[in-house]
């Protein structure tokens, strides 16, 4: 297991004019390769409004699985042109959420350094959609 510096930039497109909400997290993480994928573990912070939570990224060449554990818990799977459904658990209740991955761009080298870029839509309760973008830089 190696230490890594991870920068995660998330953007949520708020309206048709392209206004966005942007959050950037730079954190220390652990990184390992299990023969199939890179596993990145890190702690969330106040910046992400998820302080106390832990996040695990399982990064494959063709998909990424994000598991959040703590008072907010969920498992999100991102694979280009695929949809997945999940339960998002919060202190305020549980919500059904669907994810539709539009773009998945894997640019990691053999040591797991580089970036992963994802664009996806979140569908809440089958009707309300939001476009989201994630850029994960790993060094």
Q: Predicted segment positions?
A:
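N-terminal intrinsically disordered, cationic/polar leader segments
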Residues: 1-117, 121-129
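Flexible glycine-rich active-site/ligand-binding loops centered on an Asp-His dyad
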Residues: 85, 135-139
């Amino acid at each position: 297991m190696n230490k890594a510096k991870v920068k995660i930039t998330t953007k949520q497109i708020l309206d048709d004019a392209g206004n966005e909400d942007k959050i950037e997290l730079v954190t220390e993480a652990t990184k390992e390769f299990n023969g199939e994928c890179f596993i990145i573990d890190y702690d969330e912070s106040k910046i992400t409004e998820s302080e106390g939570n832990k996040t695990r990224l399982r990064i494959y060449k063709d998909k990424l699985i994000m598991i959040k554990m703590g008072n907010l818990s969920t498992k999100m799977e991102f694979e280009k042109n695929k949809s997945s459904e999940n339960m998002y658990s919060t202190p305020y209740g549980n919500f059904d959420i669907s994810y539709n991955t539009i773009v998945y761009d894997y640019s990691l080298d053999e040591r797991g350094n580089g970036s992963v870029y994802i664009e996806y839509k979140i569908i809440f309760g089958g009707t309300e959609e939001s476009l989201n973008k994630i850029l994960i830089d790993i060094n």
